[in-house]
Amino acid sequence: MDIRPLRNSDLPLIQHANLENLPENYFLKYYLYHSLSWPQLSFVAVDVSRPSQDPYDYPKIVGYVIAKMEEEPSDGIPHGHITSLSVMRTHRRLGIAEKLMRQSQLAMVETYQARYVSLHVRVSNVAARHLYETTLGFKIEKPEAKYYADGEDALSMRLDLDYIKKQIEAEEESEEASAAAQTNGSSKTNGEHLDEGEAVGEVGRDPEAGKKPMKFKIPVGRNKEASK
């Protein structure tokens, strides 16, 4: 399974997945609006185990997340919003929805410095609520009566993204420390050779150093055996 950014060529397949799985449907131009305005925030899950039949064969998209940044946030805080999330029934319970969500949230922080992300979910959608609340850590902000076209209530939810920013900063500090350590190690050994100057360990040491000289007895005078 491959998670990659949404492409404009994916939009017909996205719309098909939306119509197949969700009661909240959108016109194609609505997806295009997201793709052109915030191209970094929307992702698709592609089943790479399905081989392409020809160069014009479309990839098998089994899930997607469509997201955006709130253009004029009422609270003045930059934040993202999940417009639509869907995974085909044949590929559910594989963690795809979680991966799509986390990838989009990371992009919100890296690209737009988003402080939090919001979404709406149907009160009756138990599976989605479990994903958002239990797996991803979203908190319910408030219920919104008759939010959906069929009259069902929605829950407005929110997830603070400061923890992602801290993770990014920690990774950057770790990479900088690692690079500094490598630089220092290179400068210390530059131009130095272990076989010059003082011996280091066993390298460069005379193997005979420290041993007592061996003594041999050499006979002096006439050999008695030779005079016989």
Regions found by a protein language model. Give the residues of each.
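Conserved active-site alpha-helix within GNAT-family acetyltransferase domains
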Residues: 98, 110, 115, 123-155
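Conserved hydrophobic beta-strand within the GNAT/NAT acetyltransferase core sheet
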Residues: 82, 117-121
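Active-site acidic-Proline motif in GNAT/NAT acetyltransferases
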Residues: 88-90, 94, 123-124
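Beta-rich interaction modules in large eukaryotic scaffold/regulatory proteins
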Residues: 4-5, 116
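PTP/DSP superfamily signal
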Residues: 153, 165-166
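Short, charged, solvent-exposed linker or helix-capping segments at domain edges/interfaces
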Residues: 166-176
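Acetyl-CoA-dependent GNAT
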Residues: 8-90, 101-112, 160-164, 180-182, ...
